[in-house]
Amino acid sequence: MSASEVKAFIQHIAPIIRAEADKRGYKICSTVIAQAIIEGRYGTSTLAKVYFNHFGLKCGSSWRGKSVNMKTKEDYGAGLVNIRDNFRVYDNDFEGVAGYYDFISTKRYANLKFAADYRQYAEYLKADGYATSKSYVTTLCDCVIKHNLYTWDDTDVTGMFFPKCSPDHTSIVQALDEIGVDSSKSYRKKIYNVNFSDTYLFSARQNTAMLALLKDGMLLKP
């Protein structure tokens, strides 16, 4: 998809999700937007585009609405396997988003209302059994960071980032020291892991990437 198409999808679905989250009393919705992006492939999957199910919601035993049988992949511990299953069908995106919140409005997912941030929301989803993918939490968090989706959360996002450092710095260690943050290798690794998905090897490229975010005031705290 083009950058403009990605932006258009987020601008369309995010306000719908935020409005429904407000109605239901959820502060965090960035992870839900990320779910719509990942599960529905930016609204282009058949399930999302035709059936307005952006979240891969299966019917289960309690669903009494319309359904469609489709192929899907699941990870039961030995890698992805292809299966067929019945999925919920909605008439429009508003119903689809409301359906997601209906789905999580059970005792099983009760902890989601108390998630402090997008990462904890993703961790709760995985722990509650929403998805089988081992990388589900990382995938969602990477998506939130990539598209700055945390700006849609009902939280003080300014407290999520380190303050800007001087633009003249060429060393991440010196930059962290300047703003009074622990610059040890162990803490830098924690910082990197929150902001990037690859393994931190203390390379010059990785340190430069962290420094660039810090200069912009966009380096997330661990």
Residue ranges and their predicted role:
Residues M1-M160:
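Catalytic cores of secreted/periplasmic lytic hydrolases that degrade extracellular macromolecules
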Residues A14-P15, R119, H169-Q174, K185-S186:
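A generic alpha-helix surface/boundary motif
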Residues R24, D128, H147, I179, ...:
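Residues at alpha-helix termini
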Residues K27, A131, Y150, D182, ...:
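Short coil/loop linkers at secondary-structure junctions
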Residues G40-Y42, G180, M218:
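Short alpha-helix boundary/capping elements
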Residues T158-P163, D216-P222:
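Small-residue-enriched hydrophobic alpha-helices in membranes
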Residues M160-S183:
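Extracytoplasmic/periplasm-facing segments of secreted or lipoprotein envelope proteins
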Residues Y187-L219:
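Short, Lys/Arg-enriched alpha-helical microdomains
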